[in-house]
Design a protein with these regions (language model features):
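Gly/Ser/Thr/Ala-enriched C-terminal appendages of enzymes
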Residues: 415-543
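Structured core elements
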Residues: 125, 229, 269, 279, ...
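C-terminal motif of bacterial Sec signal peptides marking the signal peptidase cleavage site
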Residues: 15-18
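Bacterial N-terminal signal peptides that target proteins for export
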Residues: 1-6
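Right-handed parallel beta-helix
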Residues: 149, 154, 226, 232-264, 271, 303-394, ...
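Glycine-rich beta-solenoid repeat tracts in large extracellular/virion proteins
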Residues: 141-146, 159-192, 295-300, 319-322, ...
Length: 543
């Protein structure tokens, strides 16, 4: 077990002892208020040895083998997604007519414009029926939502509810870039600056994996509650080798990793400022070596946006071909993108006959819960891409997308909980340096060559992949090679794996209780209740 010292300070509230003169920087809009509901004390969990080691190391201020994943999701898991009471903008009032086989795109765009001009805090509501947002003559681009606290709301995603129809596919906008087809609907922050333009300060001190504090050169322009982007990286051969140890660097495959170096991106929230030391709400999911030249940047984003109670139907009915040359099978029917969002959500939605359901990109603390992917198999399900502390829960990939629910790029701190996929597919881990992913009480196939990502962007997943009480369905490949071309997972932590697949002991950090579930049954829930010292009602009420 890792036993490095850890600066675990008790949470004393949001205290500022060293704010700069320009502390009055405009702060982000607040997310919707949720009434405080009395919650009960959790019962102690005896748990397996990994859990006991986690509790002991946490109590002693030592680095834990299991990272603390409990900060994932809307409001860091501390509150449930709210049922907001915002002004309602009915798309019918802007010209939409359900079930008339005509375009409703212009009506939706007019409703979005009105809600945005009014300052957000708006529900854009669809009544029951089908609304066509991508007829033949529609432009080959996304419908953009660029604002705070804007909710797309339907009348339910089941029979008799609201259906948004993508009748025709969007086509690729970059020649030969098969994944460049625009999303149907894109929540985004338009006009974002480059990270270099948003630089705030340099990191001057080292920090252990799992700690909450960083020493910086200056706190000027920083304030309590501010979300930041922590960036670290190194092109040195030693850093790259350290990142994949104990394995050797695969120079014949990892061209991007070798040329661009180690890249770590984490979105963090300032909880306290003490001199030149920042205390963050979230734990650092990667150790910080100041010699790499770590930096902190402003995070330009929107907050409090959501989608709920809508069925999204594509029009894809061909046998799926991975990387089919036209790009339609890679990105023709992509439905939703959450880009530069925080404290947002997608819930109670269905995705039918789609190439890709949803991507959460460059975002933090977004929850996607109670969703399903159905109908014709396509390319991808729902992913966290280059995001931090995203919660993907209760997602049922019945279509068996080529890459099921998972992660890509520099995602970190992702929790995939109680998700299922068909026996013919496996969770996505799409290379380009994802780290610290908890796959918690999930079930589905466990097959090679479904993680995704060209070998030049490998490995598929770096440190701190945790498989907790995973139930394998379908055919087993026998011993799963966790370190081979297109299937490179850096020594995952495995506990309670159920299925015929086995693992080489040299390729895992631990393979505990193989064939039998471990306690706690759900690691995210146990870690959250341990941190909050209460049973979280929103989580226990999650179906």
């Amino acid at each position: 077990l890792r036993q490095l010292p850890l600066m675990l300070l008790p949470v004393l509230g949001l205290l500022s002892t060293a704010c700069s003169d320009d502390h009055n920087t405009t702060q982000e809009p607040t997310t919707p208020e949720v009434p405080n509901i009395p919650e009960s004390e959790p019962e102690p969990i005896a748990g397996c040895s990994l859990w006991q080691d986690y509790l002991a190391a946490r109590a002693n201020g030592e680095e834990t083998t299991l990272l603390d994943f409990s900060y994932a999701g809307y409001e860091h898991g501390e509150r449930g997604i709210p049922d907001v009471d915002y002004p309602v903008y009915l798309v019918e009032d802007y010209g939409a007519v359900a079930n008339d086989n005509k375009s409703d795109r212009e009506a939706l765009e007019a409703a979005i414009e009105a809600a945005t001009k009014a300052g957000g805090k708006a529900i854009i509501r669809f009544s029951a029926g089908r609304y066509d947002l991508r007829p033949a003559d529609a432009p080959n681009k996304s419908i953009i939502i660029n604002g705070d606290n804007i909710i797309l709301q339907g009348a339910g995603s089941g029979e008799g509810g609201t259906e948004i129809f993508m009748e025709y596919p969007n086509t690729i906008v970059q020649p030969n870039v098969l994944w460049s087809g625009p999303d149907l609907i894109r929540f985004t922050y338009l006009g974002a600056n480059s990270d270099n333009q948003l630089l705030l300060t340099n990191v001057t001190g080292n920090a252990a994996r799992g700690s909450h504090s960083l020493e910086v050169a200056s706190t000027s322009g920083l304030y309590i509650g501010q979300r930041l982007l922590l960036k670290g990286g190194s092109k040195s051969a030693d850093a790259i080798a350290q990142e994949v140890a104990p394995y050797d660097v695969v120079t014949s495959e990892w061209k991007t990793f070798i040329n661009e170096g180690v890249q770590v991106n984490e979105y963090l929230t300032i909880e306290r400022i003490e001199g030149n030391t920042l205390r963050f709400k979230e734990p650092l999911m990667h150790s910080v070596d100041a010699s790499w030249g770590w930096t902190l940047h402003r995070f330009q984003h929107h907050v409090g946006c959501g989608i709920e109670d809508i069925a999204f139907r594509g029009n894809f009915h061909e046998p799926y071909i991975h990387h089919e040359p036209s790009g339609i099978h890679d990105s023709g029917y992509k439905m939703i993108a959450f880009h530069r969002q925080a404290n947002g959500w997608i819930r109670r939605c269905r995705f039918i006959d789609v190439i890709e359901a949803a991507s959460v990109m460059l975002s933090a603390n977004v929850s996607v819960i109670d969703c399903s992917i159905e109908g014709q198999k396509g390319h991808a399900a729902i992913r966290s891409e280059a995001s931090s502390h995203v919660l993907l829960a209760n997602i049922n990939d019945m279509a068996g997308q080529e890459h099921s629910t998972g992660v890509s790029k520099t995602s970190i701190g992702t929790v995939i909980m109680n998700c299922t996929t068909a026996a013919t597919s496996t969770f996505e881990s799409h290379s380009s340096q994802p780290r610290a992913t908890l796959i918690d009480k999930c079930s589905g196939g466990f097959l090679p060559n479904h993680a995704g990502g060209d070998v030049t962007f490998g490995p598929n997943h770096l440190a701190d992949l945790v498989l907790w009480n995973y139930t394998e369905t379908g055919t087993s490949v026998g011993e799963f090679n966790l370190w081979t071309r297109n299937n490179r997972f850096l020594k995952p932590i495995i506990a309670g794996f159920q299925g015929a697949t086995t693992f080489n002991a040299d390729q895992v950090t631990v393979d505990l209780s193989h064939g039998t579930m471990v306690e706690p049954l759900c690691l995210y829930q146990a870690q959250l209740q341990t941190r909050l010292r209460k049973v979280t009602s929103w989580l226990t009420n999650l179906k």
